[in-house]
């Protein structure tokens, strides 16, 4: 029997199999593989870092087998495991040493590891983890191959000491809470670290710590600014592959996240989550200044700028500042002359989408804004607002010269012309006025 290698305890997926896994299953697979590799190092087995581990640490897809290779023949176990497929019990034995590290819910003060488990079924923590990974593999093979033989399972113990433990049935480490036993002291050591909530992987830049090395690898990209995942359509880059996958939906136009209440679809799960609050009426984000509540934190952040008066978005052309980036984007069209919104009916173009929407009502005759007092309807909300002044008697437009007030801005503008005509002509230089040639007066 040859020395143990990482490939003896590894699971490999084809591209089709990988795409059948959901996010939770992929994370579980990644953690199990990384944990297996760390166990080999911990046991003193010198192994070079496999490509699979490098891919997992970088957040890449761990695809090592091609589709035609998977179909050509059933995947067999490497080296000395090539002759037999595994039984259900063998699979359980193989997973029990890694599942406990993944699921950290068995946290009790009186939990001590003195002897190991007889089987996965005895401990709820182990059983949940084993069933999760087993279902992950079973679902994948059923979708792709419809055959139980097309799956590689973790092999458990391969060195002579571990085989002796398995054959004799001696288990030295026990969990008092569930009566569960473990074959390895390393399992106890690792479990204690998880039970204590230890975060072994620390960032040298900022000191932030993580429980898993893959999480630290992802975090480091914040400091380096590395964005290895690039969109082929627009060139935009991301730090994580999951963010790139979400971004690609923009180009495809796909909206896979649908609201069960109203049927509206969204291209991002976070957008759907925010939308659901419309139906529930939930507004968890409250302004400390005025008490106004909002559905999302981003909306609250935009609102708070009203109180501070801050205008962080400045136009490079004219220096005008805005409190929202969207307003700056719209403003820039004045300088560029961009009129991107075109009417399909008459071909007229507009700088703003809102202007196009109002214009379209001229063709349709739609008047969606109705006065509750008299029932009169209008095409624009601003027109309705001005109309309501008739009923309230309000005169918000005041002349600075004489103090006279008006209910329309247009009426105020007309009124101002009276003051302009009444103002006398002031001559600053009398000499220039005297030097002006006078017309000849003829007396008949």
UniProtKB/Swiss-Prot annotation:
Similarity field: Belongs to the krueppel C2H2-type zinc-finger protein family.
Any one GO MF annotation of this record: zinc ion binding
A family per Pfam: zf-C2H2
CC terms in the record's Gene Ontology section: nucleolus
Location of the protein in the cell: Nucleus
ZnF locations on chain (C2H2-type): 201-223, 229-251, 257-279, 285-307, 313-335, 341-363, 369-391, 397-419
Gene: ZNF506
Gene3D superfamilies from the UniProt entry: 6.10.140.140, Classic Zinc Finger
InterPro entries in UniProt: KRAB, KRAB_dom_sf, Znf_C2H2_sf, Znf_C2H2_type
Protein name (record): Zinc finger protein 506
GO BP term, example: regulation of DNA-templated transcription
Residues annotated as domain KRAB: 4-75
Chief site of localization: nucleus
Function: May be involved in transcriptional regulation.
Keywords of this entry: DNA-binding, Metal-binding, Nucleus, Repeat, Transcription, Transcription regulation, Zinc, Zinc-finger
